[in-house]
Amino acid sequence: MGSRAICIQRVAPPCFEASQVKKIKTVGSFLVNTRSKRRRSTGVKCSSIADYIGGDLVKPDIGQWLQDVEEHKAIAIYAPHEGGYEGRYLNRLKMQGYYFLDISARGLGDPETTLLKNYPVCPAHLGKQPIARWYYPPEVDYRLAALPPSAKGLVVWVLEAKVLSKSELQFLALLPSLRPNVRVIAECGNWRKFVWKPLAEIANLAAQE
């Protein structure tokens, strides 16, 4: 019996004092209160009606958009990160009679060679086939030749143009002068609302002239 009593005393959990228990409770309640205060303080506040509806839908700037595209012919756009805003401006150009060529700046290579010249492409091989080289027609000239007579022109929409160098952006800004029926829209970055600028200004062509 005595040995059993000793084992029970060893297995029994340690006892906390009343002061220690009170401290733990107070600390726990303090943490809960601070968390609730932080949650209440962090909130999204809408300052105007544009925050509820969307700044893109509030601004009636479609007329200015079409006018700038026809005047400058090469535009750099900055769309919000969530995307979807540029579709409204794209559809309005499509309603004007433009056809689109969507290309990505990543993996484009030399824009002048890809868009205006016959450019080579080496297909992947497994080591047993001979190394081949295929040639593709120029992207812009090929699609200009395939446009219907009722088309107003071709819009080259460049995705992720922020990775292009200044010289490549300068070529895109000069492309409408080489092909009069071509308009260039380059996505050069992101902003809180949909804004655009002449691509020649972004590529520093205006300063050089």
UniProtKB/Swiss-Prot annotation:
GO terms for biological process: defense response to fungus; NADH dehydrogenase complex (plastoquinone) assembly. GO terms for cellular component: chloroplast; chloroplast envelope; chloroplast thylakoid membrane; NAD(P)H dehydrogenase complex (plastoquinone); plastid. It catalyses: a plastoquinone + NADH + (n+1) H(+)(in) = a plastoquinol + NAD(+) + n H(+)(out); a plastoquinone + NADPH + (n+1) H(+)(in) = a plastoquinol + NADP(+) + n H(+)(out). Its EC number is 7.1.1.-. Residues 1-45 form a transit peptide. InterPro entries: NAD(P)H-quinone_OxRdtase_su_N. It is found in: Plastid, Chloroplast thylakoid membrane. Its main location: plastid. One of its GO terms (molecular function) is quinone binding. It is a peripheral membrane protein. Keywords: Chloroplast, Membrane, NAD, NADP, Plastid, Plastoquinone, Quinone, Thylakoid, Transit peptide, Translocase, Transport. It holds the Pfam family NdhN. Signal peptide: none annotated. Disruption phenotype: Malfunction of the NDH complex. Part of the chloroplast NDH complex, composed of a mixture of chloroplast and nucleus encoded subunits. Component of the NDH subcomplex A, at least composed of ndhH, ndhI, ndhJ, ndhK, ndhL, ndhM, ndhN and ndhO. NDH shuttles electrons from NAD(P)H:plastoquinone, via FMN and iron-sulfur (Fe-S) centers, to quinones in the photosynthetic chain and possibly in a chloroplast respiratory chain. The immediate electron acceptor for the enzyme in this species is believed to be plastoquinone. Couples the redox reaction to proton translocation, and thus conserves the redox energy in a proton gradient. Belongs to the NDH complex subunit N family. This is NAD(P)H-quinone oxidoreductase subunit N, chloroplastic. The lineage of its organism: Eukaryota, Viridiplantae, Streptophyta, Embryophyta, Tracheophyta. The gene is ndhN.
